[in-house]
């Protein structure tokens, strides 16, 4: 399951399976 969320420009927020795939900004996933 996704371990992090990232904001990708106009794409908005996207959850990625690895931190390496989080660009350009790394954000923690909401606990909920």
UniProtKB/Swiss-Prot annotation:
The modification Serine amide is found at residue 32. It is found in: Secreted. GO terms for cellular component: extracellular region. Its main location: secreted. Disulfide bonds: none annotated. Expressed by the venom duct. This is Conotoxin Cltx-4. It comes from Californiconus californicus (California cone).
């Amino acid at each position: 399951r996704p371990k992090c969320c990232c904001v990708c420009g106009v794409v908005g927020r996207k959850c990625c399976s690895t931190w390496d795939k989080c660009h350009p900004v790394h954000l923690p996933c909401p606990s909920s």
